[in-house]
Amino acid sequence: MIFFTITGSLTAAIVYDRRERRRVQQKWCDLVAHLSKETLPIEQTRRKLTIFLSAPPGDGLRIAREHFKEYVKPILVAAALDYTVIEGRREGDVRAALAERIRKHRRKAGEPSSVVEEMSNEDIIADARQKIGVVEEPGPKGDLVIGRHTWKEYIRGLHEGWLGPLDPPSPPDAPVKGPSVPVEGSETPADGTPAEENTEKKEEAEKKDDKPAKPSGPTPAYVSPAEYSSRSLPPTLPQSLDSSVPIPFPHLLGFLNTPIRLYRYLSRRHLADEIGREVAGLVLASSSRPYHDGSFSSDSELSGAMVDAGASTLSSPDDMMPSSSAKYEQQTVLEKEESEWHKSVHKRDEENPDKEREWIDDIVLDPRIASRMQRSLLSADEEARSQRITEGKEYILGEERPAPVSFWQRMWIKYGYGEDEETIRMKPIIGNLDGADGE
């Protein structure tokens, strides 16, 4: 009896959570589904978002991909939006990729640089589209950042790309070793090996040097956080950057944390609701606000009109110099996730303790960049409409809610030989091919 009680309770909790999670996700999908019905001119491509994700501390990239596919991708598919994914397998990959992307944009805008870029597949496709007159759909874009660790790399890469130089810094000088002095009166060098063997080893070393060496890590940063205040803003920096949305990515490891992990597994509907609201706000792009700094309270909300008004005042590169006492909202976003990271992540490299660590170092912001960042929000009207969708009073914009389907009919359609009305409607109607007399 005890066994059946525990098993039945656990099964009921799992089934209930999955059903509620599907219902919550369907609400946010219905909220943005009207965008997929909009038609575009033949010379325009769909609006594209940028997804930033990286392997969580202490785990692999597959976990981050599953988190994206489970909570974020269904809403993007419902809105029929295009997206680009920037992935990072190691610490610093997202930072390096974003910084290089911004530097590439600055070079294309006309800023002088001695770097000769190679044509990538994306450049070839973009050049072909430009020749035939295909342009992107006008409208606001956005960046969706998954997890606190990715968010810290995103902030670092944003500053490095806009404040750093376009040309890579010169590598540090390697220590010069003195030549070995051979012993007089002997035919072998000082190491005791014959001269022929040394010659063969040198030839093998030269062959190895000819092969391109694999990078041992991400590209080193072009500028350090301590140099932010001394760098001038590039002329191609816009008055306001694309909107960004940090997405929570709780990832707790360890056997002793099993009760917490079990509770989170049985209450994933709340996480789906929170992520769905943030993603829907970025997809609809109906409202945005600048991130708060030390002068704003956490409860204050600024409208999208104040974004342009605040950004227009930053016309000089020397405006708003860094203040050590300022506390920005970007520094506290998803801060609770850091306490759940594996303890091995917080260890410094004993051989190189001064090495930069994007995940464990404090977030350093330059006010000139931080004030240009915006955060997408779900407007009050869209929030009210999502509530009406939950209550069944409203459906996708421009459509009526279909008639409810019974449980048994739904099972017959899903697992049996039944067909829903939409599938039947899409079937071609073939007339009598044998003629009127049936021959």
From Swiss-Prot:
Residues 315-325 have a biased composition (Low complexity). GO terms for biological process: protein transport. Pfam families: Tim54. Keywords: Membrane, Mitochondrion, Mitochondrion inner membrane, Protein transport, Translocation, Transmembrane, Transmembrane helix, Transport. Essential component of the TIM22 complex, a complex that mediates the import and insertion of multi-pass transmembrane proteins into the mitochondrial inner membrane. The TIM22 complex forms a twin-pore translocase that uses the membrane potential as external driving force. Component of the TIM22 complex, whose core is composed of TIM22 and TIM54, associated with the 70 kDa heterohexamer composed of TIM9 and TIM10 (or TIM8 and TIM13). This is Mitochondrial import inner membrane translocase subunit tim54. It comes from Aspergillus fumigatus (strain ATCC MYA-4609 / CBS 101355 / FGSC A1100 / Af293) (Neosartorya fumigata). The lineage of its organism: Eukaryota, Fungi, Dikarya, Ascomycota, Pezizomycotina. The gene is tim54.
